[in-house]
């Protein structure tokens, strides 16, 4: 089997901006400020929490922080028609914030959603985090990604490397750099 050539698209689509990626601790003030900023400019927010057993508690916290927001919850243990209705409702703008598991990782295109919070980011692989971050920044608005982690010095070294790589390589077309980091591990 021969090696194949690799093609890299190095030019971003017109009017697209890099996703501003930040590593943050679990902090309600950061959540409130980031969500309010996005909602004030007419956008929507993803909040990823990959634990179904307490996802509704997280949704309750977000609803308490932003009482006027229309909050929805989506996860893979929901009945198919209920999940589909929730996701379509978010895509159509019926909800401001979607609290979800990684079910949104692939195939969900919501150009109006330009902020994503990823809770316990240290528990995900590099490609998962890159895919989730890619759910935002699909329009001509600046997008924001918040990787929520414990203090970095409390994380395993491989988790630290993953999170720092995502923060460092956030420009459009950065996927190839992340692949090279992933291969070298």
Q: What function would you assign to each model-found segment?
A:
Residues 171-177:
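Short, intrinsically disordered, charge-balanced linker/junction segments flanking boundaries
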Residues 165-170:
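Long, hydrophobic alpha-helical segments
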Residues 1-164, 177:
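Inter-lobe coupling/hinge segments of SF2-like helicase ATPases
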């Amino acid at each position: 089997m021969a090696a194949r050539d690799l093609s890299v698209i190095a030019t971003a689509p017109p009017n697209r901006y890099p996703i501003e990626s930040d590593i943050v601790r679990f902090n309600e003030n950061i959540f409130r400020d980031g969500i309010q900023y996005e909602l004030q400019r007419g956008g929507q927010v993803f909040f990823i929490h990959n634990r179904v057993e307490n996802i509704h508690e997280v949704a309750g916290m977000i609803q308490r922080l932003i009482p006027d927001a229309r909050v929805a919850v989506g996860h893979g243990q929901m009945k198919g028609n209920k999940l589909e209705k929730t996701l379509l409702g978010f895509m159509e703008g019926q909800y401001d914030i979607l609290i979800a598991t990684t079910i949104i990782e692939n195939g969900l295109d919501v150009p109006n959603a330009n902020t994503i919070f990823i809770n316990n980011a240290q528990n995900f692989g590099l490609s998962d985090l890159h895919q989730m971050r890619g759910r935002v920044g699909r329009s001509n608005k600046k997008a924001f990604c918040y990787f929520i982690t414990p203090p970095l010095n409390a994380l395993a070294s491989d988790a630290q490397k993953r999170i720092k790589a995502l923060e460092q390589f956030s420009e459009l077309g950065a996927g190839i750099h992340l692949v090279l980091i992933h291969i070298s591990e």
